[in-house]
A protein has these predicted regions:
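C-terminal beta-signal and terminal closure region of outer-membrane beta-barrel proteins
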Residues: 71, 90, 153-158, 202-236, ...
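Extracytoplasmic gating/loop element in the C-terminal half of outer-membrane beta-barrel translocons
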Residues: 23, 297-385, 389-391
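Conserved small-residue
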Residues: 151, 170-271, 399-401
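Outer membrane beta-barrel strand-and-loop segments of large Gram-negative receptors
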Residues: 95-97, 101, 127-171, 242, ...
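Short loop/turn motifs that connect adjacent beta-strands in outer-membrane beta-barrel proteins
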Residues: 11, 46-58, 119, 170-176, ...
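Surface-exposed extracellular loop regions of Gram-negative outer-membrane beta-barrel proteins
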Residues: 1-27, 32-47, 57-100, 105-108, 118-122, 128-153, 190-193, 408, ...
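Outer-membrane beta-barrel signature, preferentially recognizing the C-terminal barrel domain
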Residues: 1, 77, 81-122, 149-171, ...
């Protein structure tokens, strides 16, 4: 690793870095190492030209970087797996992949830092990155002795904006510090493996989608499907209540039952938020400091398999309310709640089209109050601060039946904000004492 930084007259700064890594995953590749550089240039405009008196500082910057990372182990040298229950060894199902390349991410960004009116500071960044050589699995015929082979392809682009706006001021003994942050990211799949050549069969790959995990315990849940032009978190559903030619939900006239039809996959949204925001404030007066942090996640969907299971067994608040109302309004009448919920839910979860919720939420993330005792009490030789802090204190707005920010910590198959009988989010309270000499 090497890094060089050059400055000129406190106006221009150039930074160049280079790094070379050797990875054991590349043991059977032509190149057993990979190099990735970066370069950044910044200019302090306020030191180069005369600025208005109220504009105290302005710096613009730009950078380009390439980051490489090795793929998962055993792709180039698959290992046999041992079953602790049957005490049998099984051969790998993935064809050994040779001459693999590291996954590359090429990115650039531009931004500025500004301070003006003596109290306001602004930091804005725009970035774009593309990731290549991703690991994609292509199917193999059973005659090969394997199920799949690794193909390195794809192009996934991320671009977005990060903004931070701050304000600091003091009036005699009263101080106020405020900070607002805004982040926006747009993710797009530019290309998958279609058009690449299968290294084993020599055939051109035509599949142009990748079906990822179901967002629950069974295939009644929504599914994440990757397609060119979409994002890495697009949600699709393929089960809905049967409808007639006029679009009305079909109800069996003799039994009053409803039924689910399997349909083509239909995109209904994505897991990722449209943007996120945060606003923190700190107020101080004669040793007393009050702080508050508000956060907001806007957009995106979330799925609750828990709600589906509770509805199926008639144990949810929704089923109780439906019984009290005398039924579920459908078409021009009502349907028995038991028949409705037994149609759209199962013992393992709910059909995705009916158990997706907006992940938008606004909360009071943190509230703190602290007091610093007068230094004269300690003969000006020490400072003692006592404080109280509460986190995740108040969910101001949330339409989902659970906290959309929770995530499973033990199973990678579930995404953040997907609920399958997970532990509820917690509200924390703390007390702290800080002594400084």
């Amino acid at each position: 690793f090497a890094s060089v930084e050059v400055g000129w007259r406190s106006m221009l700064y150039l930074t160049v870095t280079g790094r070379n890594d050797w990875a054991s995953q590349l043991a059977y590749s032509k190149n057993s190492s990979f190099f990735y550089p970066s370069v950044g240039l910044s200019a302090v405009v306020s030191n180069m030209v005369n600025m208005p008196e109220w504009f105290t500082f302005l710096k613009v910057r730009g950078s380009y970087s390439k980051v490489a990372s090795a793929f998962a182990r055993y792709l180039s040298n698959p290992a046999y797996s041992f079953n602790n229950q049957t005490h049998n060894w099984s051969k790998p199902s993935t064809y050994p992949a040779y001459n693999l390349k590291p996954e590359d991410t090429k990115s650039w960004e531009i931004g500025l830092n500004a301070r003006f009116l003596n109290h306001i500071n602004l930091d804005v960044t725009y970035y774009r990155s593309n990731t290549y050589h991703q690991t994609i699995y292509a199917p193999l015929p059973s005659s090969s002795g394997y199920n799949q082979v690794v193909v390195q392809a794809g192009d996934v682009q991320n671009q977005g904006v990060e903004l931070a706006l701050g304000y600091n001021n003091k009036w005699n003994d009263f101080t106020w510090s405020s900070s607002y942050t805004f982040t926006l990211n747009r993710n797009e799949i530019k290309r998958l493996a279609a058009g690449e050549v299968n290294p084993v069969t020599g055939e051109t790959i035509t599949d142009n989608e990748i079906q990822k995990d179901w967002l629950g315990a069974s295939n009644v849940a929504p599914q994440v499907i990757l397609r060119p032009g979409g994002s890495m978190s697009d949600i699709y559903v393929n089960h809905e209540l049967k409808r007639d030619l006029n679009g009305n939900i079909e109800i069996d006239p003799s039994t009053g039952n409803l039924s689910i039809a399997e349909t083509d996959f239909r995109k209904v949204g994505q897991l990722s938020p449209r943007y996120t925001m945060g606003w923190s404030n700190s107020f101080g007066y004669k040793g007393i400091e009050l702080g508050a942090v508000l956060t907001a996640r806007i957009g995106g969907l979330t799925y609750s398999a828990t709600q589906g299971v509770l509805d199926y067994y008639g144990a949810s608040q929704a089923t109780a309310d439906a019984r009290d109302r005398g039924g579920i309004p459908i078409n021009y009448g009502t349907v028995d709640p038991q028949k409705y919920y037994s149609a759209i839910s199962t013992a393992e979860g709910g059909y995705g089209a009916y158990y997706l919720y907006s992940a938008t939420n606004v909360r009071l993330q943190e509230l703190s109050l602290q007091y610093t005792l007068p230094a004269r009490w300690f003969r000006n030789k020490a400072r003692l601060t006592v404080g109280f802090v509460a986190k995740n204190l108040w969910m101001i707005y949330c339409k989902a039946p659970f906290d959309p920010e929770i995530s499973a910590a033990t199973d990678n198959a579930y995404y953040q904000g997907v609920d399958y009988f997970m532990q509820p989010s917690t509200r924390n309270f703390g007390f702290n004492v800080k002594l400084q000499f």
